[in-house]
């Protein structure tokens, strides 16, 4: 069945089946039982959200418990939709040895970094190494991992984050007299679509709607289409990446994620005084950091083609060699 897709979700550590309604669920349940003797139950499923940023920001991470040392400054910028995480460097080797820069780049790319809205994975962000510092005696490899993670988190806390949700590209074909019902349904589901196209065939006048719609709003809609068109309608859905979440406030409230309470992914830094380390909250790091900030934004408000709103920054002093 070309409409059936089986996926392994690394984030949730689950097997996901993308199916088109209750009928397909019943058929697959029966097939698994007949072939493997296993009775399976399909749950409602979960929506995998992601997060990005709306404005550029410099994030600072410092890790200095006793006999450890690393400080990292990173520039986080909004990336192109679907670009994931990109890494570059604008840091001179005179400031930080290239081996340390490569280690920072490795730590940026070695994991999915949680956002600060819902703890969902960060995506579509370009991260540039601006500066950093090591200690000739006390720095170990793990110190830069801690400083890098904290720099990303501090940057996210210091700027505006955007919640993203998965969307379908859809094609909906219905009898022409039912196109009004279809358009109303899609609008209620936060769908975006062009004007309908009309045609005829197989003794029926039909209308075709095409566009995008959030995955979260389309649960069991194929069954609904089948019901109200008496089997004459046809809905095709195909995953089409991520877009700004249509109900961000509701999702954030339901998730109940508290970035300040996430001890596994701290937003603050660790400094040392009088032979003991102490934690500095993310919004006070500027008062303790050992290196000056490198990034001074020249803000120019614009609305990009994808509809996301953020501020761009002009900076001519940065060079971006490949690490």
Language-model-detected regions and their locations in the chain:
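A short, hydrophobic C-terminal helix/tail in secreted or cell-surface proteins
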Residues: 319-323
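Accessory interaction regions appended to the cores of large information-processing enzymes
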Residues: 1-318
